[in-house]
């Protein structure tokens, strides 16, 4: 037996007696060993032997529960609790239970919000996405301008293809604008300043800043 284990065994009676009195609930020797082994380094044989000795000395109570021995503090050492005191304790338990449930619900809400924010684009990613969309839109505007300027040289099939692509990209425009709006709204929920200040700080420019409106479908 190591020196630390020997010292723990020597003080086992005091440790176990104090533990049962503080917890004031029934335990098997296995429960006591599992709960105290890491903190005090008590071996299982020491725990079993010490509990039996404490029971024989009348310092704790022992009771058979099936094939297992259960140990608990002698209840005679505790003051009697009146019905009024029990009602007060019950009230505190109800209040604390409600508080715990409220805190758990708040934790679930914050975890869900954190998960949503973690999956959103970062500010640099949003800025990059916006620049790419601007570049893409500028290319389509230039292409459409050239097509309109050369109307007499466009076949009906080419014209139909262009308008189909226009509808496609307008739809994508709306989709991406909606996504960008939702992401910025999510960020603004925890942002201490106004939406306008946020856009100015990160360099976000909107369609409205340039009086650009989405074409009709």
Curated annotation (Swiss-Prot):
Plays an important role in meiotic recombination. Stimulates DMC1-mediated strand exchange required for pairing homologous chromosomes during meiosis. The complex PSMC3IP/MND1 binds DNA, stimulates the recombinase activity of DMC1 as well as DMC1 D-loop formation from double-strand DNA. This complex stabilizes presynaptic RAD51 and DMC1 filaments formed on single strand DNA to capture double-strand DNA. This complex stimulates both synaptic and presynaptic critical steps in RAD51 and DMC1-promoted homologous pairing. It is found in: Nucleus. It is linked to Ovarian dysgenesis 3: A disorder characterized by lack of spontaneous pubertal development, primary amenorrhea, uterine hypoplasia, and hypergonadotropic hypogonadism as a result of streak gonads. Signal peptide: none annotated. Keywords: Coiled coil, Disease variant, DNA recombination, DNA-binding, Meiosis, Nucleus, Phosphoprotein. One of its GO terms (biological process) is meiotic strand invasion involved in reciprocal meiotic recombination. Residues 118-182 are annotated as: DNA-binding. This is Homologous-pairing protein 2 homolog. Gene3D superfamilies: Winged helix-like DNA-binding domain superfamily/Winged helix DNA-binding domain. One of its GO terms (cellular component) is condensed nuclear chromosome. Induction: Overexpressed in leiomyomas compared to myometrium. GO terms for molecular function: double-stranded DNA binding; recombinase activator activity; transcription coactivator activity. Belongs to the HOP2 family. Interacts with the DNA-binding domain of the nuclear receptors NR3C1/GR, ESR2/ER-beta, THRB and RXRA. Forms a stable heterodimer with MND1. Interacts with PSMC3/TBP1. Highly expressed in testis and colon. Pfam families: LZ3wCH, TBPIP. Transmembrane segments: none annotated. The lineage of its organism: Eukaryota, Metazoa, Chordata, Craniata, Vertebrata. Residues 93-153 form a coiled coil. PTM: Phosphorylated by PKA, PKC and MAPK.
């Amino acid at each position: 037996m190591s020196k630390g284990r020997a010292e723990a065994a020597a003080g086992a009676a005091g440790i176990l007696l104090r533990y049962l009195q503080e917890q004031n609930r029934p335990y098997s020797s296995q429960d006591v060993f599992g709960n105290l082994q890491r903190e005090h380094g008590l071996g299982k044989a020491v725990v079993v032997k010490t509990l039996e000795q404490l029971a024989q000395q009348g310092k704790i109570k022992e009771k058979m529960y099936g094939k297992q021995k259960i140990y608990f503090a002698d209840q005679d050492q505790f003051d009697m609790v009146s019905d009024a005191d029990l009602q007060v304790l019950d009230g505190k338990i109800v209040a604390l239970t409600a508080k715990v449930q409220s805190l758990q619900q708040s934790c679930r809400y914050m975890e869900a919000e954190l998960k949503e924010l973690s999956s959103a684009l970062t500010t640099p990613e949003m800025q990059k996405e916006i620049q790419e969309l601007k570049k893409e839109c500028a290319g389509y505007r230039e292409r459409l301008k050239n097509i309109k300027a050369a109307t007499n040289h466009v076949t009906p099939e080419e014209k139909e293809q262009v308008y189909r692509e226009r509808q496609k990209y307008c739809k994508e425009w709306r989709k991406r604008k909606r996504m960008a709006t939702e992401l910025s709204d999510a960020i603004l929920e925890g942002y201490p300043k106004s939406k306008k200040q946020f856009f100015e700080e990160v360099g976000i420019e909107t369609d409205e800043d340039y009086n650009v409106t989405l074409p009709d479908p």
